[in-house]
């Protein structure tokens, strides 16, 4: 059985050894846990964002960053590229932000390998039939505050490991690393919607790849939450190899997956969030999806695609001006 924590550990160790090059800080807590500050009190970097994203994906994906090859002159943004041969485990078993870490006054959304030890949430792991077994716990936290010993103790207890084997990576939404890792969820947005909204068995997805633009740092965490989500919803493009069973309606799956199927499509995410009174649970689940979905059905040989990118909404979200 693949271990997302053990697969991610060498990447964590690489980040620690390259901390100056990556513009990150490594902090050893008094209880022995290790914190990697990737953007709270440091600048971070694209390379740190790439490695952070690989860890979010449980070490089971290739991650790259480049400038888009498009020459349409509409908008030039860096892009993050993802590909994985283990889509269900990498995206839902690791990358999904499925752990609300709340300890005292500290709160962060947790994603990454440690979730597969703590089974956060249990239903997801039952759906994909996966659980990790490892003596090390690696958790990625989206927060503008660094965790303390109490948070590390909490994670260690939930994961059943010694606190000295806990690694906590932290990046605010409003940071370079934060922007990269959120755009790096482009494939996961699709598998999440497959499972949570369309109730499709994601274990049938055998390979997945995606690309999404990376938001520039344009403001505080709230503004960046809107911008980073828009990168995927209006700029994300994905490709899934699916081995269907007879009776699976893959054409309907493909049509239902992209963000354009949501009622709120066409508005910047921050506007939708405000209209929902800042309550994620009031937002149409269908909105959390890539802009374009392409599926190759390995059983039938059919290739199909649905959706479209929307540069105008991205420009509006970023308050972009062409000089």
Swiss-Prot record:
GO cellular component: cytoplasm
The enzyme's E.C. designation: 3.5.4.27
Entry superkingdom: Archaea
Keyword Cell division among record annotations: no
Compartments where found: Cytoplasm
Pathway(s): One-carbon metabolism; methanogenesis from CO(2); 5,10-methenyl-5,6,7,8-tetrahydromethanopterin from CO(2): step 3/3
Keywords: Cytoplasm, Hydrolase, Methanogenesis, One-carbon metabolism
Main localization (coarse): cytoplasm
Biological processes per GO annotation: methanogenesis, from carbon dioxide; one-carbon metabolic process
UniProt keyword Glycoprotein present: no
Reaction catalyzed: 5,10-methenyl-5,6,7,8-tetrahydromethanopterin + H2O = N(5)-formyl-5,6,7,8-tetrahydromethanopterin + H(+)
Pfam families for this protein: MCH
SUPFAM superfamilies, A to Z: Methenyltetrahydromethanopterin cyclohydrolase (SSF56199)
InterPro entries in the record: METHMP_CycHdrlase
GO MF annotations in UniProt: methenyltetrahydromethanopterin cyclohydrolase activity
NCBIfam families documented for this protein: one_C_mch
Its job: Catalyzes the reversible interconversion of 5-formyl-H(4)MPT to methenyl-H(4)MPT(+).
Record-stated family: Belongs to the MCH family.
Protein name: Methenyltetrahydromethanopterin cyclohydrolase
Origin organism lineage: Archaea, Methanobacteriati, Methanobacteriota, Methanomada group, Methanococci
